Design a protein with these regions (language model features):
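Ferredoxin-like iron-sulfur electron-transfer modules
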Residues: 97, 158-159, 243-265, 279-298, ...
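Iron-sulfur cluster-binding cysteine motifs and their immediate structural context
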Residues: 267-285, 301-317, 346
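Short, surface-exposed secondary-structure boundary micro-motifs
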Residues: 179, 346-348
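Short, solvent-exposed secondary-structure boundary/capping segments
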Residues: 361-375
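Short beta-strand-centered aromatic/proline hotspots
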Residues: 349-363
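Residues forming the flavin
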Residues: 2-232
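Short, well-ordered loop/turn sites that connect or cap secondary structure elements
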Residues: 334-336
Length: 395
């Protein structure tokens, strides 16, 4: 589905059920919504969402329901899908009678069971190993990514399933080693480059989703804050638990609210803020903190830079009765100034009426628009998405 959309400009279907709640399932679900598809449900047999909470939250706030501890019982159709039935499973992954749910869909997307693409290396005679931590059969490599066959290097999904950032750094290490082997750089230059890359790779492999934490249910962040169980099971933070995270602030004037609640390797918000208002610190997995000594100027760079769409600009005192919420907008067509609609909460349910005050674009925003909506003041900490009077995601 991702290839069809991104490379060929083809919509995979009209109404889709996504199986798998890892980062691939979450990100592709959002891309399907951007493509104009309707995502009927996001389903996973696991009891908890497997991907980053911020990616789940940006899907949930559009109204897509999550069904954890559920999987597919039956797909319907002859030459194409016409429907699907799912059911809840117990701790042994057996179907629980009476929990069946039916959806009329024309497409089922599978985002489960990822395994390393290592077949070519096996055919080339590289020594292989079965490594569950890396997702299955992978080549045995040294610290530079070189396999048992001299001159053949492996990185990314060939050597193990990880995030894209880790794959790119592994590729840089392997590329530097290959350049050294061919005489383009010295061993000293290789060591200098690979040392810096390994330091970055080590940081990316820390936090809640570190390899040693796979399969574990963590209850606290590194800062000692309770991890939201509702986020893990339903895809969104509860209104009453949001303010316990250090990026969520209440103050006069425009200010950022950062609903990042998990220790993940991410810090573009810190880099984007020229005023030093947002701090992550030296450890890339730390929760972002809003520094009150550096006032926000409302530029919106942090909102546009967050790939998890977890940052909002609030003005809780826009006027006597209203507040404004500025949120990232990546759907077409974008609402026009003055458009009336409904503000949705974190769970995708309507919370109040809303009016678009501004839709801002800039080259620095990298094609992300900033939509500012006016809402009743009492909903400032609840309204997180805009749906125009017409039906559809943001339409």
């Amino acid at each position: 589905a991702q290839t069809m959309m991104n490379l060929h400009g083809v919509r995979p279907g009209k109404r889709i059920l996504m199986l798998g709640s890892g980062n691939v399932g979450l990100v592709v679900s959002f891309q399907l919504l951007q493509c104009g598809c309707e995502v009927a449900a996001l389903v996973d047999a696991a009891p908890r969402i497997g991907g980053y909470g911020v990616h789940a939250a940006k899907v949930a706030r559009t109204g897509v329901p999550f069904y954890l501890s559920h999987t597919i019982v039956k797909a319907e159709g002859e030459d194409h899908v016409t429907g699907v039935t799912i059911a809840q499973v117990d701790e042994k992954f057996q179907f629980i009678p009476g929990t069946e749910k039916h959806f009329d869909v024309d497409t089922i997307c599978l985002a489960v069971g990822l395994s390393p693409m290592s077949q070519l290396l096996k055919m080339a005679g590289c020594r292989m190993e079965d490594n569950p931590k890396k997702g299955g059969q992978v080549p045995v490599c040294d610290s530079y990514g070189e396999t048992s066959v001299p001159g053949i290097f492996a990185a990314g999904d060939v050597s193990g399933i990880e995030e894209a950032s880790s794959a790119m750094i592994e590729g840089r290490i392997a590329g530097a080693a290959a350049a050294c082997r061919l005489g383009f750089i010295t061993k000293e230059e290789l060591e200098e480059a690979s040392s810096a890359y390994r330091a970055s790779l080590s940081q990316l492999r820390q936090g809640m989703f570190a390899p040693e934490n796979r399969g574990k249910l963590l209850e606290k962040t590194e800062e000692g804050v309770d991890i939201s169980m509702n986020l893990l099971r339903k895809g969104y933070l509860l209104d009453e638990e949001v303010e316990k995270y250090p990026g969520v602030t209440r103050r006069k004037g425009i200010h950022p609210v950062i609903e990042c609640s998990q220790n993940i390797p991410c810090n573009p918000c810190q880099d984007a803020c020229a005023k030093g208002c947002i701090q992550v610190g030296k450890k890339i997995t730390s929760l972002p903190v809003v520094d009150g000594e550096h006032p926000c100027i409302g530029c919106g760079m942090c909102v546009a830079s967050c790939s998890g769409q977890a940052i909002f600009l609030l003005n809780e005192d826009y006027d006597e009765t209203s507040a404004t919420v500025t949120l990232p907008w990546e759907f077409l067509p974008a609402p026009e100034k003055g458009a009336k609609g409904t503000a949705l909460g974190r769970n995708g349910e309507p919370v109040c009426e809303a009016e678009v005050l501004e839709v801002k674009t800039a080259k620095a925003f990298d094609q992300t628009r900033l939509l500012t909506m006016r809402i009743p003041k009492e909903y400032a900490m609840k309204a997180r998405f805009f749906r125009a009077a017409e039906s559809g995601v943001g339409a």
